[in-house]
Amino acid sequence: LDFHAEATSEKGAMGWFLDGKVQAVWGTHTHVPTADCQILPRGTGFVTDLGMTGPSRSVLGIKPENSINLFMGGLPRRYEEAEGNCKLNACLFTIDTEKKRCTGVRRADIQE
C-alpha cells in the first residue's frame, strides 16, 4: 500500500494499523528515503518513506536556485527540473504469497 502523507508519524501509525491486513506499506511524499525498513509483528513489511527518483544534484528534483530563491523571499516562479545524473530510491519487499506475509524488506538505492 502506497501511503502518500507528509508526517512520518502518520505513515508509522498507518503501518501499525494495517499490520497483518496487507503485505506491505510504504510511505511517499517527502522525497527523502528513511532507513527504517522492517517487518511488523503480524507480517507487514514497512518503510516510512521510499525517497525519490530523479536528478541527484537537486532539491526534490528541481534546480537548487529555484528553491533557494523561494526561501530567500523571492517571488514564486515556475520550477525547472534539474539536469544531470539521476538516483533511484526504492525498497524490495519479499512476499510469501501462500501465507500472505512479508518475509523480507531491504533498501535498493542506485545513484549514477
Model-found features: residue ranges?
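Short acidic, glycine-rich surface-loop motifs adjacent to enzyme active sites
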Residues: 1-9
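Functionally constrained cores in energy, signaling, and assembly domains
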Residues: 2, 26, 91
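Conserved beta-sheet core of the metallophosphoesterase superfamily
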Residues: 8-81
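A short C-terminal boundary segment appended to hydrolase-like catalytic domains
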Residues: 67-112
